[in-house]
């Protein structure tokens, strides 16, 4: 199914104090257009290498986590990944590359069924809109979510990315 929605960006008041610059950007995104297509896909084992961050702020925009990670990468021409893990007692976000790299933390994801959102629009708004849609239309399960960020300007109106949200597999 393909969808186009005008959404009001409501996270501006929830942004932590240390993200004042990002908050100003978000407030400018008062009304954005997010275009997305959704399909259900079964993925096998996945492995990533990256930097992990833990904390309560991980339910909010994570742009501040990407800065140190991307600073250590040389002008990447490959996708980067954001992996959100919430095991109940702690929240972890991993900025990552596909595959293995001994200089970074390794993370492996078990096979799962995902609602894969192909998104077009500013990444910050697009990611949150995909979660909003998934909560209404799928039974989400307690597995890590994956954000796929191709190279490019993540806040451009024509930026394209994917979000993989784990869902209960229909039998």
Indicate where each model-derived feature is located.
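A solvent-exposed interaction/effector surface
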Residues: 1-171
């Amino acid at each position: 199914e393909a969808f186009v929605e005008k959404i009001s960006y409501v996270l501006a008041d929830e942004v932590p104090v240390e993200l004042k610059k990002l908050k100003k950007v978000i407030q400018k995104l008062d009304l954005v257009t997010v275009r997305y297509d959704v399909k259900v896909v079964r993925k096998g084992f996945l492995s990533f290498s990256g930097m992990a961050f833990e904390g309560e702020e991980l339910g909010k925009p994570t742009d501040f986590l990407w800065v140190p990670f991307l600073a250590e990468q040389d002008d990447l021409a490959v996708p980067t990944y954001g992996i959100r893990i919430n095991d109940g007692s702690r929240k972890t976000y991993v900025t990552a590359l596909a595959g293995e790299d001994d200089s970074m933390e390794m993370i492996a994801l078990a096979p799962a069924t995902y609602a894969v959102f192909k998104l077009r629009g500013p990444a910050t708004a697009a990611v949150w809109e995909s979660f909003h849609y998934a909560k209404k239309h799928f039974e989400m399960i307690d597995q890590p979510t994956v954000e796929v960020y191709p190279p490019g300007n993540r806040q451009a109106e024509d930026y394209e990315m994917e979000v993989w949200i784990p869902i209960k597999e229909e039998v």
